[in-house]
From Swiss-Prot:
Catalytic activity: a quinone + NADH + 5 H(+)(in) = a quinol + NAD(+) + 4 H(+)(out)
Membrane topology, as annotated: Peripheral membrane protein
Similarity remark: Belongs to the complex I 23 kDa subunit family.
Transmembrane annotation, as ranges: none
GO BP of this protein: aerobic respiration
Top-level taxonomy: Bacteria, Pseudomonadati, Pseudomonadota, Gammaproteobacteria, Enterobacterales
Gene that this sequence comes from: nuoI
Subunit structure: NDH-1 is composed of 13 different subunits. Subunits NuoA, H, J, K, L, M, N constitute the membrane sector of the complex.
Main function: NDH-1 shuttles electrons from NADH, via FMN and iron-sulfur (Fe-S) centers, to quinones in the respiratory chain. The immediate electron acceptor for the enzyme in this species is believed to be ubiquinone. Couples the redox reaction to proton translocation (for every two electrons transferred, four hydrogen ions are translocated across the cytoplasmic membrane), and thus conserves the redox energy in a proton gradient.
Catalytic class of the enzyme: translocase
InterPro entries for the chain: 4Fe4S_Fe-S-bd, 4Fe4S_Fe_S_CS, NADH_quinone_OxRdtase_chainI
Protein's name in the database: NADH-quinone oxidoreductase subunit I
Organism: Shigella dysenteriae serotype 1 (strain Sd197)
Length: 180
C-alpha cells in the first residue's frame, strides 16, 4: 500500500465521519403520524365519494362515463330508472384495491356526483373490505359544489312535464328570439 492510497483512505474516513456528524444533529424528517397531522396539498386526491344534490337525492345518473374513463376498470355500476324518468345506479361499486386515485372518474362525471376527498386512511386487513358499495360511498352533503343540480341545469324533461315545468326549474330560453 502506497502513501497516496493511505491518504485517500484516511480522507474518505474523515469525510464519512464529518457527514455523520452533520446529519446526527439535524432535524428529523420522520413524523409520528397519529400525533402529528400529515400535510396534504390542496389538490390531494384521496378516497372517492358519491355526493347528493341540494334536494337530498343522489346526483349520479348512471351514465357509465366514470367506468369508461377509469384506466384500471375498478368502477362498475348498473342503471335503473325511477317512475318520474330519472336515472340512478341500482348498484355502484368501486374496488379500492385496484384504484390508482388518478381522478379521471371525477373529471368524466357530468353531474359532479363523484368527488375525491382528502381522506387517505383506507387500510384494511382483508382485500374484500376494499370493495365499496353505493351505501359506503354516498355522503349526506353536496360536496365541493353545493348548489349544483344536474336536472335543473341540464334542462332534461321529466315524465309528465315539459322542460321548465318541474319543481324549482326555470323556463327554457327561446334562442331564436334572441337573434337580431
Amino acid at each position: 500500500m502506497t502513501l497516496k492510497e493511505l491518504l485517500v483512505g484516511f480522507g474518505t474516513q474523515v469525510r464519512s465521519i464529518w457527514m455523520i456528524g452533520l446529519h446526527a444533529f439535524a432535524k428529523r424528517e420522520t413524523r409520528m403520524y397519529p400525533e402529528e397531522p400529515v400535510y396534504l396539498p390542496p389538490r390531494y386526491r384521496g378516497r372517492i365519494v358519491l355526493t347528493r344534490d341540494p334536494d337530498g337525492e343522489e346526483r349520479c345518473v348512471a351514465c357509465n362515463l366514470c367506468a369508461v374513463a377509469c384506466p384500471v376498470g375498478c368502477i362498475s355500476l348498473q342503471k335503473t330508472e325511477t317512475k318520474d324518468g330519472r336515472w340512478y345506479p341500482e348498484f355502484f361499486r368501486i374496488n379500492f384495491s385496484r384504484c390508482i386515485f388518478c381522478g379521471l372518474c371525477e373529471e368524466a362525471c357530468p353531474t359532479t356526483a363523484i368527488q375525491l376527498t382528502p381522506d387517505f386512511e383506507m387500510g384494511e386487513y382483508k382485500r374484500q373490505d376494499l370493495v365499496y358499495e353505493k351505501e359506503d360511498l354516498l355522503i349526506s352533503g353536496p360536496g365541493k359544489y353545493p348548489e349544483y343540480n344536474f336536472y335543473r341545469m341540464a334542462g332534461m324533461a321529466i315524465d309528465g312535464k315539459d322542460k321548465g315545468e318541474a319543481e324549482n326549474e326555470a323556463k327554457p330560453i327561446d334562442v331564436k328570439s334572441l337573434l337580431p
